């Protein structure tokens, strides 16, 4: 074929021998070479930037040929100048897709040409995106293991030209019951899906044939991110709901800070529900986390200053956990809870059950969180640090072993109905969350924020025209303390490449929009 003379110089080349046999046309500004062959059907036209403006097709050919035979090079030129001058970029087409990708891997953002300040930029041209292989490639599932490639071609050829057909096989060479078919155009692939999807049940298959577009790299990446998120959520739920001491010590910095805020504002009423065992809430988890932190800190340090800090801190914890609401105990808790800040630096130490057992020594049975804290040893801080930790650990044992699994199950059932609801909680208990992943729904956001308290509603907003997520939503709790715990734990929480933004929803009286 022959390319017409244009302002964008075009030189087609296959080898040095062809250049020598071209009657000198390659030396012309707009020279073109005749070829009897064509590039592979899946060849990629690549855009290349950051090349010297003084370079001609000859220099570019020498740059690209080490990676494979070059079919065509087009230098982009500024037509407003006479003669047209190079814009410092070009298009190159190799005969094979493999050569183009190898050149991209070796040059893109790696090699800087003489006289240039930035490395070469090499990527598929925009025109290639509309006809990418992944847009025309089909996955065929529930295929009879007796079928071969020719059988699949015969089955799908009525819907258009097939460029590639491949059956997936195991190491033993036997079919895995699925295949990939690549058509010449996306329209052909779509026609095949409409006609063939679930159209028949093949021999040896349990369900009808599946015909759909094959997963793209983007789809695979999204699935990987979803799996990572599921693992993170599982760890979060386990740490905050099932009484895992190791997990709880990892969460204590947020809870300790929250407890300090409550005590600094003299809000003892916020803790009134701790002794009630009818339902799980975030405050009970905060108590458990703080007790675990105290035990971990005592086990990991033997310095006098640490022991002193723990003595005062564990004393206040006992008062906090006690159902006895006496004024004296409340005052003691108010005066000594300020020392919880000391525990924040120690909460990172993890401690196993065996270590706590060794630390506790002889355990005197006490129900620290189950309503049985009758002694004043913890509330007035007069008991020794080891006694206080022994009692605290006894409470953890009883609480985690007897109550927490049941309470978690009850709470889980109660909160499932919150997904999709737009019911609001009290002032200061409503959260606005954005930077949510596109694929997140109401159930996902509910599962994410359940560990911090009783959720009354969880809603992801959907665009009515596109039916796609707007990537933001609302979560409401039944109390402001749970909302603050969620903010401290989840604001900045990374999901894939995104970091969540979690903040309080503005009051209805606020004239500013959300």
Curated annotation (Swiss-Prot):
Keywords: Cytoplasm, mRNA processing, Nucleus, Repeat, Repressor, RNA-binding. Residues 44-127, 136-216, 429-507 form the RRM domain. GO terms for biological process: mRNA splice site recognition; regulation of alternative mRNA splicing, via spliceosome. It is found in: Nucleus; Cytoplasm. PROSITE patterns: RRM. GO terms for molecular function: mRNA 3'-UTR binding. InterPro entries: CELF1/2_RRM1, CELF1/2_RRM2, CELF1/2_RRM3, Hud_Sxl_RNA, Nucleotide-bd_a/b_plait_sf, RBD_domain_sf, RRM_dom. RNA-binding protein implicated in the regulation of several post-transcriptional events. May be involved in pre-mRNA alternative splicing, mRNA translation repression and stability. Belongs to the CELF/BRUNOL family. This is CUGBP Elav-like family member 2.
């Amino acid at each position: 074929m022959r390319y017409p003379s244009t302002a964008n110089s075009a030189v087609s080349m296959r080898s040095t021998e062809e250049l020598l046999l071209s009657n000198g046309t390659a030396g012309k500004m707009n020279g073109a070479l005749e070829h009897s062959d064509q590039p592979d059907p899946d060849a990629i036209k690549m855009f290349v930037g950051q090349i010297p403006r003084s370079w001609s097709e000859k220099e570019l050919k020498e740059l690209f040929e080490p990676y494979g035979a070059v079919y065509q090079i087009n230098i982009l030129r500024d037509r407003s100048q006479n003669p047209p001058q190079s814009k410092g970029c070009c298009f190159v087409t190799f005969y094979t897709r493999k050569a183009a990708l190898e050149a991209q891997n070796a040059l893109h953002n790696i090699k800087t040409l003489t006289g240039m300040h930035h490395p070469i930029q090499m990527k598929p041209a925009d025109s290639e995106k509309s006809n990418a292989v992944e847009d025309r490639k089909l996955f065929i599932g529930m295929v009879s293991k007796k079928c071969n490639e020719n059988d699949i071609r015969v089955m799908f050829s009525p819907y258009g030209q097939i460029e590639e057909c491949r059956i997936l096989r195991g190491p033993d060479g036997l079919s895995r019951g699925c295949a990939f078919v690549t058509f010449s155009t996306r329209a052909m692939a779509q026609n095949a899906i409409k006609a063939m999807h679930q159209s028949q049940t093949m021999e040896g298959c349990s369900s009808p044939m599946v015909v759909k577009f094959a997963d793209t790299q983007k789809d695979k990446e999204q699935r990987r991110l979803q799996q990572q998120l599921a693992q993170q959520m599982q760890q979060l739920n386990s740490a905050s709901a099932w009484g895992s001491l190791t997990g709880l010590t990892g969460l204590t910095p947020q809870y300790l800070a929250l407890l300090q805020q409550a005590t600094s504002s003299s809000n003892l009423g916020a803790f009134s529900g701790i002794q009630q065992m009818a339902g799980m809430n975030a405050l009970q988890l905060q108590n458990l986390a703080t007790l675990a932190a105290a035990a971990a800190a005592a086990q990991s340090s033997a310095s006098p200053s640490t022991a002193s800090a723990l003595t005062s801190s564990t004393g206040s914890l006992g008062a906090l956990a006690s159902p006895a609401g006496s004024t004296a105990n409340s005052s003691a808790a108010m005066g000594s809870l300020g020392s919880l800040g000391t525990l924040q630096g120690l909460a990172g130490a993890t401690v196993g059950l065996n270590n706590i057992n060794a630390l506790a020594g002889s355990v005197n049975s006490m129900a620290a969180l189950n309503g049985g804290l009758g002694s004043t040893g913890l509330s007035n801080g007069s008991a020794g640090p080891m006694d206080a930790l022994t009692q605290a650990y006894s409470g953890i044992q009883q609480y985690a072993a007897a109550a927490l699994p049941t309470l978690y199950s009850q709470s889980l059932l109660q909160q499932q109905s919150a997904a999709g609801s737009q019911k609001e909680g009290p002032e200061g208990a409503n959260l606005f969350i954005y930077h949510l992943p596109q694929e997140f729904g109401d159930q996902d956001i509910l599962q994410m924020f359940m560990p911090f308290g009783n959720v009354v509603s969880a809603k992801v907003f959907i665009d009515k025209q596109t039916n796609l997520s707007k990537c933001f939503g609302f979560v409401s709790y039944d109390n402001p303390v749970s909302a603050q715990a969620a903010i401290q734990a989840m604001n900045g929480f990374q999901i894939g490449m995104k970091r969540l933004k979690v903040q309080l929803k503005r009051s209805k009286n606020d004239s500013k929009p959300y």
